[in-house]
Amino acid sequence: MEQCIADFTAYLRNEKKSPENTVLSYSRDLKGFCRFMQEAGVSDAAKVNRTNVMAYVYELQKQKKAGATVSRNIASIRSFYQFLQKKGMVTENPAADIELPKVEKKAPEILSLEKVELLLEQPRGEEDKEVRDKAMLELLYATGIRVTELISLKVSDLNLPLEYIHCGSEAKSRIIPIGAQAKASLHKYMERVREHMISVPEEEALFVNCNGRPMTRQGFWKIIKSYARRAGIEEDITPHILRHSFAAHLIENGADLRSVQEMLGHSDISTTQIYAKVTDRKVDED
C-alpha cells in the first residue's frame, strides 16, 4: 500500500499539478490509514474493503477527531481508490458509498478594516526586509490569495503595468487585480530590493527570504505574527484571517458574491456565502 500511496502523491504533484499543501494533506491522511490497516493485518491496497474503511472512520471518531477531519480522510481514501481504479489495480472503491459526516461551516474570523490598516502600516522602514514584507502583506490583503499561493508566485506571474497577478495551478488558474496600493509596494520591492536579496540571478520566486531562497510558509507566518505584535493586535492573526477579511470587506462594500468567489478560487459559491453571513451579522450588531 505504501508504494501505491507514493504513486498517488506523485500523480497529484506531477500530473495534476496540485498545490503542495494539498499533496501533503492527502499523504498525511493516507499514511494514517495505511498504518491502521497494517495494524489490522492488511498491507495490500487491493484487499481493503468497505468494512475496513468504516472501522477506520470509527477509530477517527473515537479519537474525537473533528467532523471536517473525518470527512477529509474519507475523501482522501476515496480519491486514492479512484486513482487505483483508473490504473486497473483495483476493481471497486471501498470508500465510494461511505457518507461524509455533516460539517457545520463556522463563521470565519475577520479583522476590522482599522486593524487591517494598522497591520499593513507596520513594515514602514526602508530596509530590504521591511520593503519586502510590506509588498507581501499588501498583496495578500489586496488579492485574498492563500499563503501557499503567495509564496508560490513567480516573477512571471506579476504584471505591474496591467496591475494583476496570475495565480493558481494550470488546472485552476485565475487572474486577480492587485490595486494601486499593492502595486506601489510591489514596484518598490522589484525596483529596489529583490535583486539584492536573491541568491542566484535565475531565481524565479517572486518573494525570497533573507538567504535569497524562496519564502516558506513558516517564514511568512513568523513575519505576519511579528508585525501583529508590533501593532499591538491581540487577535491570533494568521495569513488566512487576512484572506477572510479581504472577502468580508469586499462584500461589505458591495462586491457581488460571484466576483468574490472567482477571486478567492472557491469551487462552490456556498463557501463564499459564509462571508456574506458574517457581514450581515456585523450589520445586525451595529
Per-region residue spans from a language model:
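Conserved catalytic core of the tyrosine transesterase superfamily
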Residues: 1-286
